[in-house]
From Swiss-Prot:
It is a multi-pass membrane protein. GO terms for biological process: cell wall organization. This is Casparian strip membrane protein 3. It comes from Sorghum bicolor. Keywords: Cell membrane, Cell wall biogenesis/degradation, Glycoprotein, Membrane, Transmembrane, Transmembrane helix.
């Protein structure tokens, strides 16, 4: 049997060095930040623009539901807005990590801040999810009626806005793991 090296052929593919892997991790970090920005921004906008009005007997008497009626949903909008602003402000550091993949202290700072933002977006999304559940199911013991039978488009929008927020939670978890892996390789 003749191997490819007997014919003078050599492999052109060199193994990927640490610099290439670190740069790849930094590029993935930047991409995940953009995805998380989109998720938190979409969630904040979807929830912040949610309202529905129902006529009651006449056109002069109406029932209205909007996100600002419930402080929990207001907290959800504020939490997603803060996390979105943080993610936008963290983009330059993420770009620095692509250029200088050896930056250690800035990556450590991002781990702590990403963890704090993960806690904030988790608190906002969890609180809003509880209210969305009550809006759909109600609570017989507390005599809270489900409102989604009447305000169906309101409930669809507040339920849909949770998707982006929970997606951003996953992205932040991945960002923390990526940064930890990048630091552990040093």
């Amino acid at each position: 049997m003749k191997g490819s090296s007997e014919h003078g052929e050599t492999s052109k593919a060199a193994p990927l060095g640490r610099g290439g892997v670190s740069k790849g991790v930094s590029v993935l970090d930047l991409i995940l930040r953009f995805i998380a920005i989109i998720g938190t921004l979409a969630s904040a906008i979807a929830m912040g623009t949610t309202n529905e009005t129902l006529p009651f007997f006449t056109q002069f008497i109406r029932f209205k539901a909007q996100y600002s009626d419930l402080p929990t949903l207001t907290f959800f909008v504020v939490a997603n807005s803060i996390v979105c602003a943080y993610l936008i402000l963290s983009l330059p550091l993420s770009i620095v990590h692509i250029i200088r993949s050896r930056a250690k202290y800035s990556r450590l700072l991002l781990i702590f801040l990403d963890a704090a933002m993960l806690a904030l977006v988790t608190a906002g999304a969890s609180a809003a999810a509880a209210i969305v559940y009550l809006a759909h199911k109600g609570n017989v013991r507390a005599n809270w009626l489900a409102i989604c039978q009447q305000f169906d488009s309101f409930c669809e929008r507040i339920s849909g806005s949770l998707i982006g927020s929970f997606g951003a939670m996953v992205m932040l978890i991945l960002l923390i793991l990526l940064s930890a892996i990048a630091l552990a390789r040093r």
